[in-house]
A protein has these predicted regions:
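Anaerobic metallocofactor- and corrinoid-dependent redox/one-carbon enzyme cores
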Residues: 2-51, 55, 102, 109, ...
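Electropositive, gly/pro-rich neighborhoods at or near active sites that engage anionic ligands
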Residues: 33, 40-219
């Protein structure tokens, strides 16, 4: 049995555990959104939409899915607005139905208006308990997978919006799922078409994000990313908001302030010419991919961050943290309207780095044309049956159990070939692709996957993060014959979720190389 050796702070310290009170509040908020979703979708069918409601509901959903904590005032504002939107939507829906002689439909659900945060927690606890008691283990775990997909879509919606693009279909896709998931008699088969459509929406969101980044910041270049720290005042930009990074760099030109990136998703910034051109973008500050606690505690300046990545450790650094999240914890300063002046001004109170600290560099980026030329040639051989089995190791560069994949690549069957994204090995039948730290190059290589759906292609997912479940579902949705996942820690894929992925979605989990290769040969 191969085990994934990548453990995060979540699995070691439990810092990503969910507070029951916060979880209960989120349950109540989702009940309000569920009631509203019914009417928003009905009005959409009539051609009636409201962008202000869409923007607010998206922010509220984002807060739920990043596990945001609410103050009493924030909770009141959220539920009051949702109730107001529901009343407005009911009025417009019923008015349209009466004017057009249509039957007025109503959702088979009631939402208790609860504005006191203590009472709301109790209501949320009761709803969660009802869910726990009314659903079978299989139903509960399938419900969780649906929740994971919604979470991934909403986070991607916000990432795309921060790049200036609004993909409305994704918003309505999430509302369709929320509206369709009834606890009473929950049956996945009843929502399968909506679920499959939503996977396609998630895929389209990823493609739009990658295409928009290329349009805004230029074509990816190969670079060596410095991980050293330099003497002087500094700002750390963590997360995935490249527009925020670019704006901070622009506002700190000739200020003497050094800027560093942080986190897996920010590595791409250094490969994009419209960002890397700033000479005071000094490098990437990270001691380890997952080590937020150590990195933030040793950084000598203010930090722009998001709870998408850190969950429950933000309280450790209050006073130095800034965020663009719609809901932030007490002591974290909220950035609005792209005004980073408070973040920049905070460098004057920070220590800054007193001396140069040299570290190794990270090679990143790729020559897209060169790689596509090589992979297209291999895929043509697969198409003409000169290659019988194609193995894809990872969809991007990331950490993995090297011994398993080394053994796998050393024991490929006859007439096979491998694209290795995450394990650095090349030979006559192995092409190592030094991609970036996301799936953009993977999607480019298999841009014409329809031509190869009848071919024997096996994809091994080696990256464990908040998108792992959605990415596994997407790869399966694209039509790859065999999909394997590494054995990630329970905070990435819980054991019960793993069973549903295996039994309902036909996703394999690696065991031993010999057995897994045998599975790929039919």
């Amino acid at each position: 049995m191969s085990e994934n050796k990548t453990y995060t702070e979540c699995s070691i310290n439990g810092i990503c555990s969910i507070n029951n009170a916060i979880s209960s509040l989120h349950e109540v908020v989702l009940l309000h959104i569920k009631n509203l979703a019914f009417y928003i979708l009905k009005l959409k069918d009539f051609g009636i939409t409201n962008d202000l409601i869409k923007a607010d509901v998206t922010n509220i959903l984002y807060g739920v899915f990043i596990n945001a904590a609410y103050s009493q005032a924030e909770y009141n504002e959220i539920t009051t607005n949702l109730d107001k939107y529901t009343s407005q939507s009911i009025y417009l829906y019923e008015k349209y139905c009466r004017e057009n002689n249509l039957e007025i439909e109503k959702p088979n659900r009631k939402v208790k208006k609860t504005y006191n945060i203590i009472n709301a927690i109790r209501t949320g606890e009761k709803s969660s308990l009802k869910k726990y008691k009314s659903l079978s283990p299989e139903q509960k775990n399938t419900y969780e997978i649906v929740y994971f997909l919604c979470r991934s879509i909403v986070i991607k919606i916000v990432e795309l919006q921060r790049l200036g693009i609004d993909y409305k279909d994704a918003y309505y896709s999430v509302l369709e799922i929320i509206n369709s998931c009834e606890l009473s008699g929950f049956c996945f088969d009843n929502i399968k078409d909506i679920f499959d459509k939503s996977i396609g929406v998630y895929l389209e969101l990823m493609k739009l994000i990658f295409a928009t980044e290329k349009k805004l910041f230029g074509k990816i270049e190969e670079v060596d990313i410095d991980t050293s720290s330099y003497e002087g005042k500094s700002i750390l930009v963590s997360g995935s908001n490249l527009k925020a990074l670019q704006e901070i760099l622009e506002q700190t030109v000739d200020s003497g302030i050094n800027v560093y990136t942080h986190g897996f998703d920010m590595l791409v910034a250094h490969t994009l010419p419209e960002i890397s051109k700033y000479t005071h973008l000094k490098g990437h500050f990270s001691t380890n991919r997952h080590n937020y606690i150590a990195d933030f505690s040793t950084f000598r300046g203010p930090i722009l961050m998001s709870r998408v990545y850190m969950e429950n450790i933000d309280f450790l650094y209050r006073g130095r943290l800034f965020s663009q999240d719609p809901y932030v914890s007490k002591g974290i300063e909220k950035i609005t309207n792209d005004d980073y002046s408070s973040l920049i001004n905070a460098t004057s109170q920070a220590m800054g780095f007193k001396k140069y600290n040299q570290r190794t560099s990270i090679h990143a980026g790729f020559d897209e044309e060169k790689i596509l030329e090589a992979t297209d040639e291999i895929l043509e051989k697969l198409k003409s049956n000169r290659i019988k089995y194609l193995y894809v190791i990872g969809i991007c560069n990331c950490e993995q159990d090297n011994s398993y994949y080394e053994d796998l690549l050393n024991n490929l069957p006859d007439k096979s070939y491998a694209f290795s994204f995450s394990y650095n090995k090349s030979s006559n039948n192995i092409y190592h692709i030094n991609s970036l730290y996301d799936g953009r190059l993977f999607l480019k290589i298999f841009r014409n996957i329809e031509e190869y759906k009848d071919k024997n292609i096996s994809v091994f997912m080696t990256q464990g993060d908040r998108y792992t479940v959605a990415n596994l579902l997407t790869i399966k949705h694209l039509g790859f014959k065999h999909v394997f996942s590494d054995n990630f820690p329970d905070n990435i894929i819980a054991p019960n979720t793993k069973e549903i992925l295996k039994n309902k979605f036909n996703i394999n989990f690696i065991t031993d190389v010999k057995s897994d290769i045998e599975k790929t040969m039919y």
